[in-house]
């Protein structure tokens, strides 16, 4: 007897959507592909989906709603843009679909599996922050849980230019705004800042991330232990996630405090964390760790939701 699965649709046939489709077909425990949706009839993602016998449409959200199997689809991943998501989500909520938002729209609550895994599973829409956020905010949170006060968190995400499709490029401002907010909401920093760099180097370089925090009332050994534990947690769903170098510390004394917008001058312990994310190469090569961490986090979240729903239906 085959294991019951919930049908999933993906809106957005670009790099992220195509990588996610392959992950669902190869690794998902509780989902199966029900549709791939795009707006470019010549996109590689739609062509691949068609070759894999996945129902496709190049007519966007309205095309999805017209597909014969639309009623069977239980969860929809939106990998379009922040602006498009607002329209898509309104229609999907009206139709009673579970929505996993891979855009920076942040309509639903921020979700990072390593931090608040199951907390928002019953929400109709959950937001996966950004690729940079998925990679770095677990580290901000790791520092937060080991200190009394996390004054500041700043992340710099460097991704290969080749891995950034038109959707990513159109959402740069939303990326920084959403990631900065999530550093505060999920990471626990009083003030957050995010920077993204599209690296044009050839051959393409692997995703690299730097995390800076300023904390007070913490022990270096406890902070480092928390960081190492968090790295192992993320690695359970993103095997290519790792610390690039040993955690670095620097004391910022009262005699030379830093100025933080919205807070003022502050001193404490500066922690620097250097990360590397190697992709699983399901679609783009291994340098595209930014795709891998985003789609892996989304799939883990959806699989957990699906497992809960299937268990309820079987009860």
From Swiss-Prot:
CDD domains: ALDH_C. Signal peptide: none annotated. The active site is at residue 131. GO terms for biological process: catabolic process. It catalyses: acetaldehyde + NAD(+) + CoA = acetyl-CoA + NADH + H(+). Gene3D superfamilies: Dihydrodipicolinate Reductase, domain 2, NAD(P)-binding Rossmann-like Domain. NAD(+) binds at residues 13-16, 163-171, 290. GO terms for molecular function: acetaldehyde dehydrogenase (acetylating) activity; NAD binding. Keywords: Aromatic hydrocarbons catabolism, NAD, Oxidoreductase. The keyword Membrane does not apply. It comes from the Bacteria. Its EC number is 1.2.1.10. InterPro entries: Acetaldehyde_dehydrogenase (IPR003361), Acetylaldehyde_DH_C (IPR015426), NAD(P)-bd_dom_sf (IPR036291), Semialdehyde_DH_NAD-bd (IPR000534). It holds the Pfam family AcetDehyd-dimer. Belongs to the acetaldehyde dehydrogenase family. This is Acetaldehyde dehydrogenase. It comes from Xanthobacter autotrophicus (strain ATCC BAA-1158 / Py2). The lineage of its organism: Bacteria, Pseudomonadati, Pseudomonadota, Alphaproteobacteria, Hyphomicrobiales.
């Amino acid at each position: 007897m085959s294991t019951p699965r919930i049908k999933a649709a993906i809106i957005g046939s670009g790099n992220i959507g195509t990588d996610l489709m392959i992950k669902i077909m190869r690794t998902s425990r509780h989902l199966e592909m029900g549709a791939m949706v795009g707006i470019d009839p010549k996109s590689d993602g739609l062509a691949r989906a068609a070759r894999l016998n996945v129902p496709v449409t190049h007519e966007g959200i309205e095309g999805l709603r017209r597909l014969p199997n639309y009623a069977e689809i239980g969860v929809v991943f939106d990998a379009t843009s922040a602006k498009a998501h607002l329209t898509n989500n309104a229609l999907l909520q009206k139709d009673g679909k579970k929505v996993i938002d891979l855009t920076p729209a942040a309509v639903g609550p921020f979700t990072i599996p390593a931090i608040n895994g199951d907390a928002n599973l019953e929400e109709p829409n959950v937001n996966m922050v950004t690729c940079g956020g998925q990679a770095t905010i677990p580290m901000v949170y790791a520092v937060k849980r080991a200190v009394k006060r996390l004054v500041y968190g700043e992340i710099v995400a460097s991704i290969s230019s080749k891995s950034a499709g038109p959707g990513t490029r159109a959402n740069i401002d939303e990326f920084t705004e959403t990631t900065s907010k999530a550093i505060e909401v999920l990471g626990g920093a009083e003030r957050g800042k995010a920077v993204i760099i599209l690296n044009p180097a050839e051959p393409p370089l692997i995703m690299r991330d730097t995390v800076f925090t300023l904390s007070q009332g913490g022990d270096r050994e406890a902070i480092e232990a928390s960081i190492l534990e968090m790295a192992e947690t993320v690695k359970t769903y993103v095997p290519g996630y790792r610390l690039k170098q040993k955690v670095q510390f620097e004391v910022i004394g009262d005699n030379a405090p830093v100025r933080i917008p919205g807070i003022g001058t502050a001193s404490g312990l500066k922690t620097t964390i250097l990360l590397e994310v190697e992709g699983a190469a399901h679609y783009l090569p291994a340098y595209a760790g930014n795709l891998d961490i985003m789609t892996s986090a989304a799939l883990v979240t959806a699989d957990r939701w699906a497992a809960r729903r299937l268990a309820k239906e079987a009860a």
